[in-house]
Amino acid sequence: MIDKIISLLEKNADTNQAQKMSEYMQNRFEFAGIPKPKLKELIKPFIKETSKDNIDWNLIIELWNCKYREAQYVALEYLQKHRKQLRPDNIKELKYMITEKSWWETVDTIDAFVGDLVLMDSGLKNLMLEWSTSDNIWLRRVSIDFQQKYKEKTDENILENIIVANLGS
């Protein structure tokens, strides 16, 4: 499956667009040069084909480790489609995704998945407190943002503790 996706990215690569996309991300990542709307269209068959399957973390991690940034976007689309299958013990895979190839545009998607897990297992709030003092800025960011879709379910005490832990950081 991974080879099929990489082939799809390479067949649709646009070097001029890739350079612009890379520059926008401060040259932190290599791009194939496929804008997100086109990428979503290209991967629709893959997402549909795998939508009824069990979540495949090996595939997600392989995509995450791919050289093209668009592969990480494919992983996030796949994860979004399988979101209902997420379980609290998947926090380790999400942490990997947060701390590897980190940048705002992927981390800000993952934080909602983390939020889902914390709602399933309130014991993960302690992990969010740990992350709030991590040396990794992206774990800190997720600890601050994981509740952003909670509305009335927001735990104001934990939010306050996390914000206080990050004052001046």
Region spans (language model):
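Alpha-helical scaffold domains
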Residues: 1-169
